[in-house]
Amino acid sequence: MEKLGLNELRERFLKFFESKGHLRLPSFSLIPQNDPSLLLINSGMAPLKPYFTGQEEPPRRRVTTCQKCIRTPDIENVGKTARHGTFFEMLGNFSFGDYFKNEAIPWAWEFFTEDLKIPVERLWVSIYEDDDEAFEIWNKKVGLPPERIVRMGKDNNFWEHGTGPCGPCSEIYFDRGEDKGCGKPDCKVGCDCDRFIEVWNLVFTQFNKEEDGSYSRLKNPNIDTGMGLERLACVMQDVNNLFEVDTIRRVLDYICKITGVEYGSSEKTDVSIRVITDHIRSTTMMISDGVIPSNEGRGYVLRRLLRRAARHGKLLGMDRPFLSDVASVVIKESKGAYPELAERAENIKKVIRIEEEKFEETIDQGLVILSKYIEETRKKGEKVISGDVVFELHGTYGFPVDLTREIAEENGLGVDEEGFREKMKEHQNLAREDYQSKQGSAWGDDIYSKLDKSVKTEFLGYTESEATARVLYIIKEDQVVDEAQKGDSVTVILDRTPFYAESGGQVGDKGLIEAEGARVKVLDCKKTNDGKYLHIGEIEEGTLRNGMEVKATIDKKRRMAIARNHTTTHLLHKALRNVLGSHVNQAGSLVEPDRLRFDFTHFSAMTPEEIKSVEDQVNEKILESIAVDIREMSIDEARKMGATALFGEKYGDVVRVVKIGDYSIELCGGTHLNVTSQAGFIKIVSESGVASGVRRIEALTGEAALKHFDEEEKLLRDIAQVLKTNPSDSVKRIESLLNEIKAAQKEIEQLRSKLVSSSLDDVLAKAVEINGVKVVTARFDQFDMEALRNTGDTIRNKLGSGVVVLGTGFGGKVSLVVMATKDVVAKGIHAGNIIKEAAKVAGGGGGGRPDMAQAGGKDVSKIDEALKQAVKVIESQLAG
């Protein structure tokens, strides 16, 4: 049996099925699209669900993929065993109503025995116990003897997911040899020992499970297969676990090299090495696909993995951030299959480095705190660390709960996870793995899923702004109706339309649908996965009936404004990459008629110079009046041209390419200008952060940009008028006024100091003594809070030992300050507690340290009373 590397195996599989008429699709993003049931893609078929359900039309009836997958339910076992991992690649060949068992089974056998040359005698199969059809194909067509075909029950060999498409499956097993088994004479497929390893699962989706639990046959059965690439590599390389597979082993070896720890020297260090190896593979792929560390959802999964890996690095003696270096090895090993890794390498490593540095700031302190709580828990004779402690470690020190659990288990303790979850709920910040149960299923129904799936709306909007059409459906109050009257809110589905439906960040068109005796004001347009355009609006006149001939007309002026912003968004994306670097990728966008919003990956606020450079570059391209060339082509042809694809977007065999000269080329389904000069110009109005590693630009074009400049110009004129100068001299006038103010403030401060100096002796002379402690109270209404604090410092220093209580009503606001020398703090004085009670009298609040505190209040007339209350509290503290 030929020893093949993981990368070669992947390519051999995909090429084999291409030879069988399959379209090779690139791996979909790990971020699910329109599937609230999943946090991250966890199987080869997950991103293909819409094709299996008929919600979307597949690019071809036969498809093959190698899909990146993440699974984290068993994260605590990763590292402890050599089998568990969070990242894996799933090979698959799929048929959407095309071929079935007669082809799928022999092809699987052909790939194994002829392409990979796996010895026939090492292969076994299992089938569903009632699937005689599969048995006949394996036995008669393939030639496998009956004793090597094992019938198994529903739990093992029948795939179903609640209600919906389901069916039997057949699994192919590799016999690792008797020496890996249990030694029992009846050992075969299904035995719990390590001899037989399941390599390939062929799912025959031929039934539909109904609500009542019955099964009906699907008109067009499907094929869904899945084979773990790493597991296949274990077989072909004759190794015992995924960490010994060639590409993964090279990552592991690099970790050993930089830590100076030999793999296999101890089980404890082996666990840490395996944790880092697995987690860096997962995190590198997640960041490449646009996941950013956060405290919720998939961002929290990423943070957990990175921080767990960082902690295990410390256990190996790493005292510096190192994970981004290891990520470079992952990128090197996988960039052939996933070229985007190389393109985004800088971005990936920067995300990892920043997150590791953040954790580095708190982990040591957190470990000290956790050690203290572990010791306290043991002293109490308890076995569980409280949920409050787990929450404190999570919120203050950035410890994911599974990291706290892992450390607790190493010390023979458990954690109160239920208590932790309750605390998280209180703070509305629960990041959960059971996202699926909270968000519902991607297989769920709505009114539109019950409509005829073969009915689609023909989109004419790329070339037409109005069109005649026929009403196919009218939906009112979530019900399909035959007609609707004036005043009704409706959704209208037409057989053809010029209305663009919201997608790709571009908002839907507005306009009118008119017929004889009826008019609908369209306020928005969306579309279903199966291609129906939903014209959402209100009937302004008459009665709209199903089957009516209508005229659909978009708001052309609004559409043009949207096109300005959409084309400019493409220019902006390219300019950002030119100015900031190739790590910049689109993380989201909103294209409206009056503005554009663009989110992108970058790790610091842009400087004013960078913003100006981007803006200038976009305006330069607008002024060049570059033709916007839009055409359809194959996805392969588009990639060869260098077209930029967006994170997580699904693309079919044929794609729409928007090319702006030699400057920008992107895959895009939106509406655009004919030439860039139609945009007028761009004005960036804001740049801000929206998440860790994600920045946002908001900008205006065309009329909106002109309006913005008009408003700015008016503001400048108004300022100049107030300053009694010309607009061009406003800055000089403001600088002059600021200098005058600064000089005046300096003079005031000098006068204030003289005033304080002259009155200090009087203030100190009025000091009272309480239980041997000097207490000074005074009121300075001419001082603001800053001056009051400075005066308090001066009096405390002159006093030498004692308490100072000052108040002011400057500007109509109450300000109070309490200061104490260290020796009286030792006697029981606490400035924070004193001021808290004093401020209540004046209708305010505050607090602070034992030696210094300040507060505010609302009632200036109560200042003297507040000072007296402070003295009472001091008496109480000294008496206690």
Swiss-Prot record:
Its EC number is 6.1.1.7. CDD domains: AlaRS_core. One of its GO terms (cellular component) is cytosol. Its main location: cytoplasm. Zn(2+) binds at residues 566, 570, 668, 672. Binds 1 zinc ion per subunit. One of its GO terms (biological process) is alanyl-tRNA aminoacylation. Belongs to the class-II aminoacyl-tRNA synthetase family. This is Alanine--tRNA ligase. It comes from Acetivibrio thermocellus (strain ATCC 27405 / DSM 1237 / JCM 9322 / NBRC 103400 / NCIMB 10682 / NRRL B-4536 / VPI 7372) (Clostridium thermocellum). The gene is alaS.
